[in-house]
């Protein structure tokens, strides 16, 4: 009888181990599946990179849903910004926003220069300079006396114009964060300095740290596609206080503004 009880105990333990292992495997599959979904969601736009001629977007349509009015061809919104802490307590943030309206085939936006202070009472100093896109060139619409800033604006390139994500599917073992209530999804990858996009960013921007960059793919909204919400890319080179260094990129398709 004791022998039979021991056999029964061993069988029970074995079944428990299999069940626990199975649950762990299920979680791994779900996590892997979510990572794949995030990549696939981003691939819909990142497959277009690099967009050498931004005016090509007039002939490209993104995800459409019920938020679009009848006859609205939609508007592409682009943003690229670079932020860096050059002295304690303040982060310099510069970049450009551009709206490409597929109805009017006009592209307007602005270049912004901002300082973000630890002391929030000082955060009232963003400057904007109006721009438009003509023949795939940025045209400055405001008078800018600072010649260095003027050249920076007129020669500005969005990350989407030179980035290449053909190896996106090869990024592995990302740290996945999800919040189904918002909903929001994020995949985070540690890159090395030999990464193609990292090397390009180091050539263009004053990135002083030699640390490997962290790539974040962030989605707010339906992971399968939605004109409500957004997708954002971040290359974070340093999170150290007073050494923060980040590149942000945003390319989304949505309903057109009636006033645009």
UniProtKB/Swiss-Prot annotation:
UniProt cross-references to InterPro entries, sorted A to Z: Csa (IPR007595), Csa_sf (IPR038641)
Membrane topology, as annotated: Lipid-anchor
Keyword Cell membrane: yes
Lipidation (N-palmitoyl cysteine): 23
Annotated signal sequence range: 1-22
UniProt keyword annotations, A-Z: Cell membrane, Lipoprotein, Membrane, Palmitate, Signal
Disulfide bonds: none
Gene3D superfamilies: 2.50.20.40
Places the protein is found: Cell membrane
Major place of residence: membrane
S-diacylglycerol cysteine lipid modification positions: 23
A GO cellular component annotation in the UniProt record: plasma membrane
Domain of life where this protein originates: Bacteria
Homology family: Belongs to the staphylococcal tandem lipoprotein family.
Official protein name in the record: Uncharacterized lipoprotein SAB0389
């Amino acid at each position: 009888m004791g022998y039979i009880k021991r056999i029964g105990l061993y069988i029970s333990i074995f079944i428990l181990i299999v069940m626990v292992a199975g649950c762990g495997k299920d979680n791994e599959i779900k996590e892997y599946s979510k990572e794949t979904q995030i990549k696939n969601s981003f691939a819909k736009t990142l497959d277009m990179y690099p967009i050498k001629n931004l005016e090509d977007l007039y002939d490209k349509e993104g995800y459409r849903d019920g938020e679009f009015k009848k006859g609205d061809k939609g508007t592409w919104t682009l943003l690229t910004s670079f932020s860096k802490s050059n002295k304690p307590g303040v982060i310099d943030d510069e970049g450009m926003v551009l709206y490409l309206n597929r109805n009017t085939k006009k592209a307007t936006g602005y270049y912004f220069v901002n300082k973000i202070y630890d002391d929030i009472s000082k955060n009232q100093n963003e400057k904007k300079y109006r721009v438009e896109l003509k023949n795939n060139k940025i045209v400055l619409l405001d008078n800018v006396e600072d010649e260095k800033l003027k050249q920076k604006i007129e020669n500005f390139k969005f990350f989407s114009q030179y980035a290449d994500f053909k190896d996106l599917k090869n990024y592995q073992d990302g740290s996945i964060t999800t919040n189904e209530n918002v909903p929001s999804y994020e995949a985070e990858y540690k890159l090395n300095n030999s990464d193609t996009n990292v090397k390009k960013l180091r050539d263009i921007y004053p990135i002083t740290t030699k640390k490997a960059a962290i790539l974040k793919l962030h989605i707010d909204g339906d992971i399968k596609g939605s004109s409500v919400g957004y997708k954002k890319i971040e290359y974070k080179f340093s999170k150290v206080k007073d050494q923060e260094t980040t590149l942000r990129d945003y390319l989304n398709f949505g309903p057109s503004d009636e006033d645009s």
